[in-house]
A protein has these predicted regions:
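Bacterial N-terminal signal peptides that target proteins for export
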Residues: 2-10
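Bacterial N-terminal signal peptides
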Residues: 10-18
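Sec/Tat signal peptide C-region and signal peptidase I cleavage site
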Residues: 20-24
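Electrostatic cytochrome c docking/interface patches
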Residues: 29-66, 122-126
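Sequence/structural segment immediately N-terminal to covalent heme-attachment motifs in c-type
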Residues: 43, 55-84, 88
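Sequence context surrounding c-type heme c attachment/ligation sites in exported
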Residues: 61-69, 80-81, 106-110, 128-131, ...
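Gly/Gly-Pro-rich "capping" loops immediately C-terminal to redox-active cysteine motifs
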Residues: 64, 79-122
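Flexible coil segments in periplasmic/lumen-exposed cytochrome c-class electron-transfer proteins
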Residues: 124-183
Length: 183
């Protein structure tokens, strides 16, 4: 009797699995596949090497005006913070109990700044800035941190070449251009 029950149980499990596998590939019958153009609109990631940076350019002067208009209400007139996070300062604090993890002290790649601003800022209108505006704001924030001079202009060819102060502070499968911590 136990063999007969075991065979029936095995057969029932196999039948259930077979039905589940056969139906797994069926669509729900709603929606449609995204077009390549629709996918391209969301494929906006930027790597530390600069791959994915869009055409465009922006300089510190332009970035200062854009920052005053679209960023200062949250990050302060000069990136000092309040009510949101500080963007400047904090160099030398990463080993402190409460380090200031700012763009200038913590972030390993300038392209990370571009990617974050492009995707998520301003907070009330993410992805609303043009590539030129994002290059300009990136230039201004890096200028405020003393990383680039006032006459800096960024574009897809030079942004990834910026050497950030904490570029060697991370262990990464994809180290920033020009080096990075080795695992």
């Amino acid at each position: 009797m136990p063999d007969r029950i075991a065979r029936r149980l095995t057969l029932a499990i196999a039948a259930t699995l077979a039905v589940g596998v056969s139906r797994a590939g069926e669509p729900y019958g709603i929606g449609r596949p995204a077009t390549p153009q629709e996918i391209a609109g969301w494929d906006i990631d930027v790597s530390p090497s600069g791959a994915g940076l869009p055409p465009g350019r922006g300089d510190v002067r332009q970035g200062e005006a854009i920052f005053a208009d679209k960023c200062a209400a949250c990050h302060g007139a000069h990136g000092e913070g309040k009510p949101m996070d500080r963007l400047v300062g904090g160099v030398g604090t990463l080993r402190d109990k409460k380090p200031d993890k700012t763009v200038g002290s913590f972030w390993p790649c300038a392209t990370t700044l571009f990617d974050f601003v492009r995707r998520a800022m301003p907070l009330n209108a993410p992805q609303s800035l043009t590539p030129d505006e994002v290059y300009a704001v990136s230039a201004y924030v890096l200028f405020l941190n003393g990383i680039v001079p006032r006459d800096t202009t960024f574009d897809a060819d030079n942004l990834a070449k910026i050497k950030m102060p904490n570029r060697n502070g991370f262990v990464s499968a994809q180290p920033p251009p020009g080096g990075g911590a080795k695992p």
